[in-house]
Design a protein with these regions (language model features):
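Conserved DEDDh/DEDDy metal-dependent 3′-5′ exonuclease domain
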Residues: 39-49, 65-66, 83-215, 220-235
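N-terminal accessory regions of nucleic-acid-interacting proteins
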Residues: 1-71, 77-79, 117-118, 152
Length: 239
């Protein structure tokens, strides 16, 4: 049976939006994810810096040697209502720069939106340092290509990364792992629970009711994938 995934808008400020995504796996207690979204038009990065400080404190409490972060970069060219883009042309989507950086530590997600059309925009140095730190392990699906593209387009240098599909194959206990295996299907294999969810065939990038805000589906399913990737990474990287 597919999980139920719901979204609640918690705080709406001039700079950011805080969302709560509730996941209800079958026969399990609900899991609540907290997602901070930071849009491209907002100059105040203090909440992003606070988010990084917060997850590092959680890391210390967990006594984890390395900070494990899941990474799911995304681009609007493959979504409905995203606006015209040169990269919407057939065969060009993969060349488009990423426009949304989805990160997750435990139940805490950060959606940081950046825009390649604003080459002089200054991004929070704390975020770049966190991702490039050798003590940060960045995990994801098909992450090698994403790491290369982020460095090319935004000078984000991620030195310590792990592809979760490849790592699961190394264990040789999870059966065949397809090259396009989704976060939900990989979670079923690695975490041992049912994490299937019914996603819409197509999703909108923007919220049709609130101008320039991400759609609810974009936030809740992006948060789910980021959370599952984090949980898978923690499990596969156990000593």
């Amino acid at each position: 049976m597919a999980m139920e995934v719901s979204l609640q808008h918690e705080i709406d400020t001039d700079d950011d939006m805080l969302y709560l995504t509730t996941i209800r796996p079958a026969n399990k207690k609900p899991i609540i994810l907290e997602t901070l979204w930071h849009g491209i038009d907002y100059p105040n990065d203090s909440l992003v810096i606070d988010w990084i400080s917060k997850i590092k404190k959680f890391q210390e409490k967990k006594k984890q040697k390395n900070l494990i972060l899941s990474l799911f970069p995304d681009r609007k060219a493959q979504y409905k209502n995203s606006g015209f883009s040169y990269y919407d042309c057939k065969g060009q989507v993969s060349k488009a720069p990423f426009e949304l950086l989805q990160l997750c530590f435990d139940n805490h997600c950060l959606f940081y939106e950046f825009e390649h059309y604003y080459p002089h925009k200054k991004y929070p140095l704390a975020l770049w340092k966190c991702l490039s730190d050798n003590k940060t392990i960045v995990v994801g699906l098909g992450i090698e290509d994403a790491v290369k593209k982020l460095e090319k387009d935004y000078n984000i240098k991620i030195s310590n990364w792990v592809d979760l599909r490849d790592k699961a194959r190394e264990k040789a206990t999870f059966g065949e792992i397809a090259n396009n295996c989704s976060a939900e299907k990989l979670a079923n294999k690695v975490l041992g629970d049912e994490w299937d969810v019914n996603k819409p065939a197509t999703m909108e990038w923007w919220n049709p009711e609130v101008k320039w805000f991400l759609s609810d589906d974009n936030v809740k399913f992006g948060s789910l994938d980021s959370f599952l990737a984090y949980r898978i990474g923690v499990e596969l990287l156990k000593d």
